[in-house]
Curated annotation (Swiss-Prot):
One of its GO terms (molecular function) is ether hydrolase activity. Gene3D superfamilies: 1.10.8.1080, Glucose-6-phosphate isomerase like protein, domain 1. Pathway: Amino-sugar metabolism; 1,6-anhydro-N-acetylmuramate degradation; Amino-sugar metabolism; N-acetylmuramate degradation; Cell wall biogenesis; peptidoglycan recycling. Induction: Induced by MurNAc 6-phosphate that releases the repressor MurR from the DNA. Repressed by MurR in the absence of MurNAc 6-phosphate. The gene is murQ. This is N-acetylmuramic acid 6-phosphate etherase. It comes from Shigella boydii serotype 18 (strain CDC 3083-94 / BS512).
Amino acid sequence: MQLEKMITEGSNAASAEIDRVSTLEMCRIINDEDKTVPLAVERVLPDIAAAIDVIHAQVSGGGRLIYLGAGTSGRLGILDASECPPTYGVKPGLVVGLIAGGEYAIQHAVEGAEDSREGGVNDLKNINLTAQDVVVGIAASGRTPYVIAGLEYARQLGCRTVGISCNPGSAVSTTAEFAITPIVGAEVVTGSSRMKAGTAQKLVLNMLSTGLMIKSGKVFGNLMVDVVATNEKLHVRQVNIVKNATGCNAEQAEAALIACERNCKTAIVMVLKNLDAAEAKKRLDQHGGFIRQVLDKE
């Protein structure tokens, strides 16, 4: 697909004279364009749901969720991956973000990195990609060689693959088994796909990882019951989670958390089923860590 024919490279009539307007009007133009992004994502919700189900199936079987991107797309994948361990208590290697150019590229532009097909393949080889893993290629343009080659390699291994782009019929979309293509239109600043396209990608990634965690029993109601308390704010959040899930008071919640080494799931089952920490943990283990199953089946 030629660059000049891509929707993400088109000219936006709404911002044609944005350099001549007041600061407030400039903000309004950008905000009006941003409002269209959730609607674009809404139109591809069935595709997102299908991807979540596949990701969950693979991860449940011992696989990983691998994000692969360059520039903004790569950084968004790393951002999403890095938030999963503290939020949901998963091991750091379960959700992995790879960016063209490596760690240096997180904060700096690396010349030619996104054009390296070898880079995409080698980065996946370096994490010992297996057929159990799911590779999600992220590229606003849908034409990034680093991402396309990575998806091709992943499919050769037998991996399930997802392609996220903002141009219909792109190489990323056609290479991946599952395509998620929110069409956000031309950017306010022509070609600056870190804006609307980047926002759309972030919304999609939020759904992929959050959907995976919900289906994996990491959420009870709407509470992040596997949160790891790495700071004072999260210690307080743990107490509030146990309170909200059980109806107990703060003192009871804290006592239960202390008794089970600050595991929210165990504390919740302890309070709701009137169990000690060991028995609560045992029952959770018997039901794969799903609080709902412990409560519904016992």
